[in-house]
UniProtKB/Swiss-Prot annotation:
Binds 2 magnesium ions per subunit. Transmembrane segments: none annotated. This is Xylose isomerase. The gene is xylA. Its cofactor is Mg(2+). Keywords: Carbohydrate metabolism, Cytoplasm, Isomerase, Magnesium, Metal-binding, Xylose metabolism. The keyword Lyase does not apply. It comes from Salmonella typhi.
Length: 440
């Protein structure tokens, strides 16, 4: 097979002084950070959809890219050609993982039966590619939002027959993920929401999607899948309002249906932006709630109201994200998947490498800065000092339920409490973070 990226052998680490645009300056897979290999901390993955499925089309223009596997031809043969190029890319980029939707890797076919047959053939192709390359599957998922049948949602659709079609795709994609050794399975509700409340029964749709997720959990245990189930929050787009709005909303949903011990979250930076949150906020919230799973590493544009899916380039933002992840013990089954695409004007095939290399270097440098923050411990010390009162007798009595509201009021009066506000020192802490970021 002729190489598609024929001007490149493999992307390698050359160090911070390198000016080679096809080399890593900060990502050194074998470098030890806090006693652990950088590759094992970051667990990078490249995604199939933006990298190999998007043809450069947008709402105002047709496809701008010249990808051989996107030309007219026999669907399965083109899918196999796409797989050839994808695994060439994964190998040359030196990522240990990849991610896909079902219809990214396999033709959808004209019927559910044809869909399943096509997918089964492509799973065998992917299994062989994984064996040859050593690249593993971080997670798989089903695209239950592109087909016109899902215009009113999949699990939240008013038609139970559409719900059943979605179940077919999800069970097939879960089985494929399991067979390929995937470490997670993701559920993103692209159209699980509404356009208008005038034709929407919120209680009904919530019950439907709750039951759907319960069925997914049941199937996971039935098939013996040991990976993690993940919901990916997003507030809107393509619907006006989605039910998985943000991490906190997802947690409330999981609690309602008794799923908080079964499903975690896959957090995308751009989705946090759309929800009016920082990426840091969503990561910290998931960790605090015990549902942190994996990350879609990208960036949005705060001046735009849609999902731009750009590659992450902000060390300032991502150092704080990696700091939270390190403090929480790091990834288990999750990782950093680049849910990002080159711009429509970036028509050189090597732009795919430039985008990923920059993103990987950004996250690697962020990791190293976060490690310095952890080792220094100053931020943790200051937070602990701020809440120290809760480790005292009064604080512990309150938290352990040993005082009622009335008893606490009586205590305050008897002890003539008149506490004085203590400074939060926000500016000092911001300066401290800048020292980690910019001082050698």
């Amino acid at each position: 097979m002729q190489a598609y990226f024929d001007q490149l052998d493999r992307v390698r680490y050359e160090g911070p002084q390198s000016t080679n645009p096809l080399a890593f300056r900060h990502y050194n897979p074998d470098e030890l950070v806090l006693g652990k290999r950088m590759e094992d901390h970051l667990r990078f993955a490249a995604c199939y959809w933006h990298t190999f499925c998007w043809n450069g089309a947008d709402m105002f223009g047709v496809g701008a890219f010249n990808r051989p596997w996107q030309q007219p031809g026999e669907a399965l043969e083109l899918a196999k050609r796409k797989a050839d190029v994808a695994f060439e890319f994964f190998h040359k980029l030196n990522v240990p993982f990849y991610c896909f939707h079902d219809v990214d890797v396999s033709p959808k076919g004209a019927s559910l039966k044809e869909y399943k047959n096509n997918f089964a053939q492509m799973v065998d192709v992917l299994a062989a590619k994984q064996e040859q390359s050593g690249v593993k599957l971080l997670w798989g998922t089903a695209n239950c939002f592109t087909n016109p049948r899902y215009g009113a949602g999949a699990a939240t659709n008013p038609d139970p027959e559409v719900f059943s079609c979605a179940a077919t795709q999800v069970v097939t994609a879960m089985n494929a993920t399991h067979k390929l050794g995937g470490e997670n399975y993701v559920l993103w509700g692209g159209r699980e929401g509404y356009e208008t409340l005038l034709n929407t029964d919120l209680r009904q749709e919530r019950e439907q999607i709750g039951r759907f997720m319960q069925m997914v959990v049941e199937h996971k245990h039935k098939m013996g899948f040991q990976g993690t189930l993940l919901i990916e929050p997003k507030p809107q787009e393509p619907t006006k309002h989605q039910y998985d709005y943000d991490v906190a909303t997802v947690y409330g949903f999981l609690k309602q249906f008794g799923l908080e011990k079964e499903i975690k979250v896959n957090i995308e930076a751009n989705h946090a932006t759309l929800a009016g949150h920082s990426f840091h906020h969503e990561i910290a919230t998931a960790i605090a709630l015990g549902i942190f799973g994996s990350v879609d590493a990208n960036r949005g544009d705060a001046q735009l109201g849609w999902d731009t899916d750009q590659f992450p380039i902000s060390v300032e933002e991502n150092a704080l994200v990696m700091y939270e992840i390190l403090k929480a013990g790091g990834f288990t089954t999750g990782g950093l998947n680049f849910d990002a695409k080159v711009r429509r004007q970036s028509t050189d095939k090597y732009d795919l490498f430039y985008g990923h290399i920059g993103a990987m270097d950004t996250m690697a440098l962020s990791l190293k800065i976060a490690a310095r923050m952890v080792e220094d411990g100053e931020l943790d010390k200051r937070v602990a000092k701020r809440y120290a009162g809760w480790n005292g007798e009064l604080g512990q009595q309150i938290l352990k339920g040993q005082l009622s509201l009335g008893e606490l009021a009586q205590y305050a009066e008897q002890h003539h409490l008149a506490p004085v506000h203590q400074s939060g020192h926000q500016e000092l802490l911001e300066n401290l973070v800048n020292r980690y970021l910019f001082d050698k």
